[in-house]
Curated annotation (Swiss-Prot):
Keywords: Cell membrane, Coiled coil, Cytoplasm, Membrane, Phosphoprotein, Repeat, Transcription, Transcription regulation. Expressed in ovarian posterior follicle cells and wing disks (at protein level). The gene is kibra. Residues 54-87, 101-134 form the WW domain. SUPFAM superfamilies: C2 domain (Calcium/lipid-binding domain, CaLB), WW domain. This is Protein kibra. Residues 942-966 have a biased composition (Basic and acidic residues). PANTHER family: BOMB/KIRA PROTEINS, PROTEIN KIBRA. One of its GO terms (molecular function) is molecular adaptor activity.
Amino acid sequence: MPNLQQTASQSQHHLHPHHLRPQQQQQQHHHHHQQQQQQQHTHHQQQQQHHSDFPLPDGWDIAKDFDGKTYYIDHINKKTTWLDPRDCYTKPQTFEDCVGDELPMGWEESYDPNIGPYYINHLAQSTQLEDPRQEWKTVQEQMLSDYLSAAQDQLENKREMFDVKQQRLLWAQEEYNHLKLAASRSSLCSSSSSMSRHDPELLRADLMLARERVHQLKQELTHITNDISYTERGMNTLYSVGEKINARENGCYDIAEVHAIREEMLKVHKSLVSGEKVREELMRSLVQIKNELGRQQISEENSDLASPFDRVCVASQTDLCGSSGENLNGGARFAEMAKTKWQYAEWRKHIKKLQQQLADHVERIEPGQLESDKDRILLIQEKEKLLNDLNSISLKSRSEEEKRVIHQTRHKLEEDLKEAYEANNTCVANRLRFHEEKQLLLDKLQEALKSTKLLEERLKSFSSESTFSISSGSSLGSLSTASSKSALSFTDIYIDPFAVDSPIDVVDLRRRSQRLFQQHQQQRLHPVHPVLQQQQSAEVTLSPRSSLSMETPPASPMKYNAGADQTPQALKEEPTYANALPAPPAYTAPPPVPISGVRARPYDLDSTVLDCMMLEAKLQKLNMGTPLNLAVAPLSPISEKPSLLDLPQEMLSRSSSTSNTRSVSAAVSNESVAGDSGVFEASRAHLPRKELAQVQIGLKYLKQEGVLVVSLERANNLLALWTASADNSQVYLRAALLPNSLTSIRTKALGDFQKPVFNDTFAVPITLDKLLTKSLQVTVVTMTGQKEEIIGTVQISMAEFNPEDSTLKWYNVLSSKFIPSFESLDIPSTSAAAAAAAVAASNAPNPGNNREESSDESTITSSQTSTLTRNQAPCMELQEQMAAELLGLGPLNEPECSDDDDDDEEEELDDKQLVSDVGLMNSSSMLHAYLQNMKQEFADKETNTDRAYLPEKSRGQSQLMDDRPVKRSQTFTPSEAFSKNRYNCRLNRSDSDSAMHCGVAPHTFQRGAAERRSLRFHSKAPKSVTKLHHTHIPRTSLDLELDLQAQHSKLYFLNDQIAKLQNLKEVLQKACENKDPLVAAWAIENEEFQRLVARADPAKCPEERQLQKLLMKTAKEIHKLRKTKVPKGCPDLVSFKEKITFFTRKGLSVPELPSEFTLPEANPIEEEEEEEDENEFYNSAETAIAINTALVASSNRNKNLSEHPHRATSGAVPKIPAPVVTPAATPAATPAATPAATSAATPAATPVVSPAAQPDAKPADAPIPVASNDAEQQRFDYVVDRNYGVEV
């Protein structure tokens, strides 16, 4: 026994890796596996506890490595291993015997902080990324094979379209040569007997049209060739990926290769970032050159005309923009801010809803199917055009052989078209309908993002003008990239606006499909949505000659009938605030130029615009449940200038544009907003005045007396506001000047609701300067017995009132049902004399109330805002009520996905900060309750700390009320009497303490803080780093290889784009220096070039650029929302399909200058060129035979594709043959990159093993040195391998 122990001890000492491993190898080995030691150690400890009931077999022993990791010694075979020999008794032997999440004997799961979980096969001495228990890898391979089969059919469609287009080009060239020959001969022996053929002018015009047609067909042929090259390259990449994965053992990468691929992807990503900067700089240079060419062309045409690139004064349109908050006192600004916060919260909720709808919609759409449907429809159209071209050929001068060939070609085309028409295309129509619905949701989302950004900027402007704080960053505006320490996400690789071409016009495509396939069902289909009828010109059309996507000028909203044009489904949808914007998407598509020009700063809008957005949206939300006409719903109360048709003749010469137009009006109509924005000229012709509730009000100011005369004349159709019975009810009008109105004036009560005539005049003493800062609020009140109810309101801005004139206008009344709640008016009604006396008393000085608050001058100065607003503070009960409503709303930002990136955490924190700072308040209830309950003591007094307390004898009565203590800043004067025991006065020295609303959490006052704003600007809490984002979605080697090849493809096309942009820049610079008119005309008229430079136009307003970033971020959020629906541990099929379709999508195309702008001009008069022209004339018979042969060959190659759109192939798919493309018509696919572009966009060679490196996928063939370690290594009999546990 001692000998055995000694032998075991010696053997253990001999086999211990700490003594056998060289020092260098030991350190390298320890560093390589240091990250997984703890987890594997825990695993083996659990294994020891689990195997404690079973003894070790004979000849086995347990030892620990220098780092504490347990391994096992087989003394019989003289080997060491990580596997416990007792696993054969406790673990299943095969995967079929496993239950739940068990792994069979010899398998181990480990975790790497960079690549996540991976698996070790100790028996086969290998590691792999895939989970061996899941069959996701097999599903991926089958999906890849199916897609390659479908992509092969799509490629055949493109090639057949190329053949048909080439045949059309041949016929067009033949027609052009016929016309040239006829024009050059200029004799009666022409090929046609028509006398019009002999007119030189007509011949010249026909020749011009034929030349343009040939040029256009060549351009279309170039586009198709580029599409074929993009598709072929993508399919070749997918084939190479599949072959590379299948060539490996088990189709899996080991961990070392995964690390190498990951490092290579990060390096390529850095190259992409630097290359994108180079591309952006080139595009900005192209914009400058294009503008210079435009100036040169305009100066050549007419030097007297002003350049359109000069600055245009829009002072008349932006006169409303000024800082409206400057003329608003604290109370009105507080109310305006609360309304804006409420709107912002509602918009955020609506955006979340749209994102969820888009995430649900994407699941019903097959990735890449839209491109296939487009190719199929365009192929049929090309055949139709070729058939029309053949039918238009005159056969009189043709030989019999030519006639026979033409007839055969026509017959073949007719048969192909008949088969296409008779095919079942219901699926195509349904898919296009899904895409159209998706486009509609995207348009709604874009409008929602615009409105949200406008409100966000509005809130930031409030923050700069008041003491309320708002976070400097918002999730909607921040678009930080993922951390460089983490791997690239799906959205970083595959969601790139420059990686794919412009989106397809789905509406145009669906119209084509309806015309081709479903002409007999057009009446049963839903009409196209008005928004989609006016796609922007930035979207690419299906063909250069397509006229289906032409823009139409926007019409006036007053000419739009929603009930007639919108579908019932659209009418039943929940309306959004976007319907009330100046360019509402439900009414008319906003033109890009006027909006960007007028609204360069959306947060400078007047408060009336925001009120319109809220009130009009509430109007539609309450009335869109039933299919109502817009004419039935009353417009919002307006203070807009009436049309010239409403003004008397003596007032037509007066203009109100010079008056102060800063307004505090509650709302304006859609017409006034759109009219002010310059989109259209407001029209009165279609205003349904007879169905609106209106009030006629007269205003006149007497300067000598200092009195405003208000005349409440009559009303019209008040029954539109009163839903109950008008029997035993009366109505009267009540008016008050807001804010800080002591009194209100009221008319007599009448029983007529249809056309009541009041004829009541009141005099309100007020100075002119104060009058221009107020607004007149007129409310319509009904009385039924002792009960009074407000049924409508009108608010008129006195800023637009001209004191020199007397006005008498009709104003629309907003119904009270569109406002959440109205509090009863507690302001007593008085006569004009009483009002004058009250105003006079309020203007009297009161020196007894002037008390010095603090000797600190800085504190007094910084408290001016709160001091001026002390009389506008709402009562404490109202604040507590609003706080309770805030708590009831709950947070807006719900966690979307458990595996968000670090930047998403920051954005969520910004969202919470913004929401907490903004405070979600019920705007209408706060506004009206505050304005009606407010009581003014003094108008202009300094800091007041005195107040009237309830006498002690009234404590018994006050017990019935709320006994909660009232904590208020001493700089505020409470508007209600409280007991001294309930009132706690605090003298705050910070400039922001006294104005902080109840929605902001209190923070400790920091003495000596920067600018004494410790409560406004406080440091954000550090982000928690304890949360680990461990994804449970399986990731395979095929996913990793696809990601790597996608990065290489993006880099390849980026170098291609940079080279083309550099070439285009050089050519345009030379043309600009030489003042070449042809190149200048091409740069201005080419639509593709215009779309390209529009992406980087510095003249584009920052809001549009921010909107593009928001759309990009929203796409990522939609992807995350869709991922949350995938069950935990299940593969995401849609994401994988999007990965493989990424390779066959066409990237951003850069236009190339044509080598020849025009074909050689034909001279119809000179006959010296007759012989030369005859030599250029083609043999018509040979041309027709060649066309027929090519058509038959292409038809045989692509027969019955519509019946088998997704033909799956079993086994490996053969390599793609080369496309049948004419060399003369094929442009250079990969021009050499310029040295600057190559140095900026090509990644440096790195000494890493890259098993996924593709020679054809890299932009530059930089040699990558293979990592080799030829150093002398010592060999031992037994060395513990830390991965496999076998002898090395």
